[in-house]
């Protein structure tokens, strides 16, 4: 059962929308803008990066979702970690993550990025990039398809739309 406040808000919204008005909250507008203008930065480490390139190509066209790949971490708000993360590469991943401006999100793509994958028991592999950076969305598969990546990005957009306020930090420790 919905709260009476939300029911009144819905009734008012319906009445005004019939007359050509739009009634919204600033949080909703900010969430909509953030979700529909993601600028991902690729951190392609292995074969999952090929699927990521396929998702950005003309057949799937991630640009239609408002996503534009950026070469610099200072210009991007989404990091897609695709592939096997080694112990030598982990400090570089953390450094790039720290250079990103807030709000920032991380998407872990593939079994290797999620938990080490096929190389889980190797001495040189980090068993999941979530040990180095906080991850918002996990995409399973070896390698995951371009459709799975786009589905994961759409789930991230839903998550971003649910956030409120100007500052986003779901990883606060108390």
Swiss-Prot record:
It is found in: Cell inner membrane. InterPro entries: NADH_UbQ_OxRdtase-like_20kDa, NADH_UQ_OxRdtase_20Kd_su. It catalyses: a quinone + NADH + 5 H(+)(in) = a quinol + NAD(+) + 4 H(+)(out). It comes from the Bacteria. SUPFAM superfamilies: HydA/Nqo6-like (SSF56770). One of its GO terms (molecular function) is quinone binding. One of its GO terms (biological process) is electron transport coupled proton transport. GO terms for cellular component: plasma membrane; respiratory chain complex I. Binds 1 [4Fe-4S] cluster. Its cofactor is [4Fe-4S] cluster. It is a peripheral membrane protein. Signal peptide: none annotated. Belongs to the complex I 20 kDa subunit family. HAMAP family: NDH1_NuoB (MF_01356). This is NADH-quinone oxidoreductase subunit B. It comes from Rickettsia canadensis (strain McKiel). The lineage of its organism: Bacteria, Pseudomonadati, Pseudomonadota, Alphaproteobacteria, Rickettsiales.
